[in-house]
Amino acid sequence: RFAKIVPAGNFLVVTNHKYKDLVLQHIPEIGEKQVLCEPIGRNTAPCIAYAAYTLLRENPDAEMIVTPSDHLILNEDDFRTIIGECLEFADRHDALLTVGIKPTRPDTGYGYIQVSDDHTISKVKCFTEKPDLELAQTFLQTGEFYWNSGIFIWKVQAIVEAFRKYLPEHHA
């Protein structure tokens, strides 16, 4: 789905060593240098930092789309439109963006994002990681919360600066 947004030559995939061959098999348009193998599995932030610093060396003006590999996207046209709007916004504002999904039910399997207003792109008030059912029901009723999709968009320089400022242990 991202090949219609970004040329495959610009992809970077961060994965575990044991999945490298599988990634290359499933995405034949990319080369081995585009698959970054985590030295140690340590969650999302180190993977993002690894990709960001790799990309920073090659293209400091680049934008990044960070996405899990297992999303179900039913309307790819709408998805591409949203990603395009986010890329434009991130480019103009050096902002760190996350894509929220309007919840259809209370669900304890997702993290939630509370937004500050009802605009298409709005500031995040807070993140809540996988609430209990009662809190998820409250979130749904307020209309201020979205499921956290795990999709993030930013300029590489903006995320590197965020690592420097907020997670210096991941700043190279």
Protein language model regions, located:
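A short acidic, often aromatic-flanked loop/helix-cap motif at beta-alpha or helix-coil junctions
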Residues: G41-P46, R105-D107, L133-L135
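Conserved donor-nucleotide/metal-binding helix-loop-beta segment in metal-dependent transferases, i.e.
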Residues: L72-T108, D118
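Conserved N-terminal catalytic core of the sugar/cofactor nucleotidyltransferase
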Residues: R1-V66, L74-R80, G84
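Generic beta-strand structural signal
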Residues: A62-M64, A95-V99, T108-G111, S149
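Short beta-strand segments
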Residues: V14, I65-P68, T98-K102, T128, ...
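Catalytic core of tubulin tyrosine ligase-like
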Residues: Y110-A172
